Amino acid sequence: TNRALLLTDEGQALLPGLAEAFALMHHALASLETLDDTGVLTVSMAPSFAAKWLVPRLESFQSLHPDIDVRVTASMNLVAFADDGVDCAIRYGLGQYPGLVVDKLLDESVVPVCSPALRGMGAPPDLLRDVTLLHDDSPEQDASCPTWRMWLKAAGIDGVDAGRGLHFNQASLVLEAAIAGRGAALAKVQLAGEDLRSGRLVRLFDVSQPVAFGYYFVCPPAKAAQRKVALFRDWILRETKADAAYPKKN
């Protein structure tokens, strides 16, 4: 049989007060996330972006805000902000992140690079027929990011065995191998920016090929109101704006 639950007269009398109390409790719990300014900022991003872009610049943020301790979580996994204890993230994608605050940081493109010593061994495209090709097999690749086979075909360069060479599962390892003179790499320009500016890497061709993915700052709306997140967001927007205006050629 179906039985309905009915409040007693005493329960009916208490109901308005209980509803108000639960509403206040919900509001207080929701406010805790906004008020959590412990001084520890946890940021998630891809390993290669952390190693090649963020780390060289992180001292700037620390000098501006010494009271904020930054914890970098390097992972390709999409974080669950509440469950993983992450305040904000830098994501490589198309910018479609429903329910999150999203800021476009940087576009990305790809260009062949090598060490200055290797470049001195010959001129492209002949050089590509003689050197080891370095391949990026990382999950950071997107469908619009060319492989060596795709790039060589688009450039009209033949006589190069596009399948040979060394393979790595992280973009930063590809760049480190190129810096060490192990071969030529198809480098993401944003990741290789510091190495190109410093002369550790040089371009083999002037033309870079844009890719569909870019880099985005994301965080939950409640996190965006926190001082530590707001300061990091403002800082990285300034850094990426300056970076986009600074040439990455050598």
Task: Give the location of each predicted region.
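Basic, amphipathic "hinge/linker" alpha-helix immediately C-terminal to the N-terminal HTH DNA-binding motif
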Residues: 1-24
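A short, exposed helix-loop element centered on a Lys and neighboring polar residues
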Residues: 26-33
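Immediate post-signal peptide segment of exported/extracytoplasmic ligand-binding proteins
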Residues: 36-41, 126-130
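Short, well-ordered beta-strand segments
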Residues: 42-44, 89, 134, 185, ...
